[in-house]
Regions:
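Short, surface-exposed acidic
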Residues: 95-97, 259
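Catalytic loop of the DD-peptidase/beta-lactamase superfamily, centered on the K-T-G motif
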Residues: 72-85, 89, 123-389
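An acidic site on a long C-lobe helix of protein kinase domains
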Residues: 7, 63, 141-144
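Active-site-proximal loop and beta-strand segments within enzyme catalytic domains
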Residues: 1-61, 68, 75-78, 85, ...
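Short acidic alpha-helix initiation/capping motifs at coil-to-helix transition points
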Residues: 61-62, 241
Length: 389
């Protein structure tokens, strides 16, 4: 997007999340999509930064993908093979895979769930994110990740064998992006190294990273001064438990007074969830068979967004009066549009994790010109504007 930044950007920048883009920007186009790694990297030129290069933090999965794609240029091995040969196999992580394809056929694999947008537990399909593999997309388990943590806590060694040079490991922990330098709670600063967050907590330096895919959120943390490593894997993505448990364990090991963090946070979480469900129920109550201001065929056709590509809107065959959106960059993603009133439609994805929202078509002189489309904040925060062809 910015030719000057293109000339200056380095691998270090891509691993530091300070290109100036927003957190998760572009992920609705890339996540669980049919885009190849090459196509994702090409489309990064359309990400308009809202922040300042090398100053503002914005988590960027496509940046990590790009950094990972440098590996085959240097080693001749794809990212997934190089990581397996250099890290997973030497650490004896026997139950860890670098590709997610085929997980649904595994006999002992956790299944993804969510309570988002419904207030009840729902089973989700597995994300297919091998196209974003270098952005931390591993299938693993607590026992295997414990070996990774032991390597981190022993300056790059595992069972006495050098896995990663200490100089390299130490460099990943050097703060590359300042997120905050002001006191907040029990922390005085927070920042990001190369693929790792860091902060102080009750006088100890803490390193951690969370992870997420639809139906899963994880938390891995280590405290070198205490020789402490923590990994938390959960298969329900709409909760704060995976964060609170980390602090509950940290507090216990640091011998801090006990505080029931769940008791403190849960009421506010439940109130927010109740408000969200009430809002969605209110939208659904407005579905009364009203007629939109233009004939249904006026809304059908192809719409385009420069970053995403094309969506196709058609009349839903089995539900007269409804419209169906096909997202052409995604394999199985669909959404229905049900007319409410006052030019407003209810948008509901067939994958519950993508969410439920309202939207309105843009028109000029009784001609449809476009439609804004929103997905869950878990994917991307901002809506996309699709222009009718």
């Amino acid at each position: 997007y910015d030719s000057a930044v293109t000339k200056m950007v380095t691998i270090h920048d891509m691993l530091s999340h300070h290109l100036g883009t927003k957190t998760f920007q572009g992920d609705f186009s890339f996540w669980d999509s049919k885009n190849s790694r090459h196509e994702i990297m090409y489309k990064m030129r359309y990400l308009k930064p809202s922040g300042t290069f090398r100053q503002d933090f914005g988590y960027c999965n496509s940046c990590f993908l790009t950094a990972g794609e440098i590996i085959p240029k240097v080693t001749g091995k794809p990212w997934e093979v190089y990581v397996y040969d250099s890290l997973i196999q030497p650490l004896g992580m026997e139950h860890t895979q670098t590709l997610g394809y085929g997980i649904s056929r595994m006999p002992n694999a956790a299944k993804p769930h969510t309570t988002a947008f419904a207030g009840k537990l729902q089973l989700l399909p597995y994300d297919q994110v091998d196209n974003l593999g270098p952005a931390g997309s591993l299938l693993s388990c607590v026992s295997d990740l414990s070996k990774w943590l032991m390597m981190q806590l022993d300056s790059g060694r595992y069972n006495g064998k050098r896995i990663v040079p200490w100089e390299v490991l130490r460099t990943t922990r050097d703060m590359a992006t300042i997120i905050s330098s002001r006191k907040r709670g029990d922390s005085h600063f927070s920042g990001y190294g190369l693929g790792i967050f860091e902060t102080d907590y009750h006088g100890k330096q803490i390193f951690w990273h969370t992870g997420g895919a639809f139906g899963f959120v994880t938390n891995t943390c280590f405290v070198p001064e205490e020789n402490l490593g923590i990994t938390i894997l959960t298969n329900q993505d709409n909760q704060d438990f995976f964060e609170l448990l980390r602090y509950q364990i940290l507090n216990a090991y640091l011998k801090l007074p006990f505080e029931n963090l769940s008791k403190t946070v849960l009421p506010g979480f439940l109130d927010e969830e109740t408000r969200e469900i009430k809002k969605i129920d209110g939208w659904k109550d407005r579905i009364k068979g009203n007629t939109p201001p233009l004939p249904l065929k006026s809304y059908t056709g192809q719409y385009e967004n420069t970053l995403y590509g094309t969506i196709t809107i058609s009349e839903e065959r089995n539900n007269p009066g409804n419209l169906l959106i096909k997202f052409n960059s995604h394999q199985n993603l669909l959404a229905t549009l049900q007319y409410l009133d006052n030019d407003e439609w209810l948008l509901t994805y067939n994958n519950p994790a993508f969410g439920v929202f309202t939207t309105s078509f843009l028109t000029k002189n009784n001609t449809v010109t476009g439609i804004p489309i929103k997905a869950s904040d878990f994917v991307e925060f901002d809506p996309y504007l699709f222009i009718k062809k």
